[in-house]
Amino acid sequence: MPTWVRAAPDISPDPTNINMNLSSPQIDAMAERLDDAMRQRRPLEPLTSTHPGIDIDDAYQISLRWLHRREAAGERVIGKKIGVTSKAVQDMLDVHQPDFGFLTDRMELADGASASLSALGLIQPRAEGEIAFMLNKDLQGPGVTHQDVLDATAWVAPCFEIVDSRIRDWQIRIQDTVADNASCGVFVVGTQRTDPAALDLAGVTMRMQRNGQPAGSGRGDAVQGHPAEAVAWLANTLGARGIPFRAGEIILSGSLAPLVPAQAGDRFTMEIDGLGGCSISFVD
């Protein structure tokens, strides 16, 4: 397991920046339904179908209530993630703006892990090849630039994020995926640590294989032109809600290529130029 020291991230929003359409009991009920869907591995109908008035602030509050349930069950927040950052993923999901969520220690697996779909509550997982950022300085938006991100980064590493929607058949709109903690499932960070100043992250290429066969590839500039731009976007988006980045957090910057469905028996490997690689396998 990883050995770096993690901060205790701030996750409580500034209440003056919240404008919700749904009532607090409705938000609690949706968080409970998402939690039950994960634990029972039974996907829900889209929240935007059952509650058409839901907006981004509602969705974000649902994700926080769900996160608080997970913390109450013993999970610990260790970072944040950005999703739907590349055009390829936006086109695939028909969601045309990034989303955001939180990472807990239960979501993190060791490089080369054999992941049990049932034990982890994964329903309809898909693999993403990403670049992970480990922060060694605090960042507070708004006004964070991609250079600020690079200056605050201790190292970058290759990362598999295994996204998973608790929404049936991935029929999501932006409110659905934000409420669903940005469709986060589990993640694996490679063991090679690289100074982000040592190479051009926009120009690197990621190559993914599933069961020894090519499964996808993409460049760093597929993620908002530069992975650090995506991290800056998240710092500013959460900063507007009163939530900073803290030193010791790990940030997943978004997929470099289209998502690849995963099932029991699959083994995924991935390499990124200059950053090394990582792998993950799946069992029932």
PLM feature segments, named:
Residues R241, R246-E249, D266-F268, G276-C278:
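A short pocket-lining beta-strand/turn micro-motif at the edge of beta-sheets
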Residues V231-V260:
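A conserved acidic, glycine/proline-rich C-terminal tail/linker
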Residues N21-H226, Q263, R267, L275-D284:
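Catalytic-core "active-site belt" of small-molecule-metabolizing enzymes
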Residues D10, D14-N19:
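Intrinsic-disorder-associated, low-complexity terminal segments enriched in Asp/Asn/His/Tyr and depleted
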